[in-house]
Amino acid sequence: MRMTRVRSLCLAYARCVRLGVFRCISLRGWAPYRAVETVLVQSALTSVERLHEMFRVY
């Protein structure tokens, strides 16, 4: 279930990028983009680590 959420987050992120969010970001500065990217990457890594732990236990 968690992987599905991460996947949907990544899809939404890719959709935003495709819609030209980069142009808006370049006007405002890169700080918001970096923050969003960091949060997405961290949540994805956390999910992968949890899956790895589950598989290692069994």
Curated annotation (Swiss-Prot):
Superkingdom per UniProt: Bacteria
Name of this chain's protein: Uncharacterized protein TP_0293
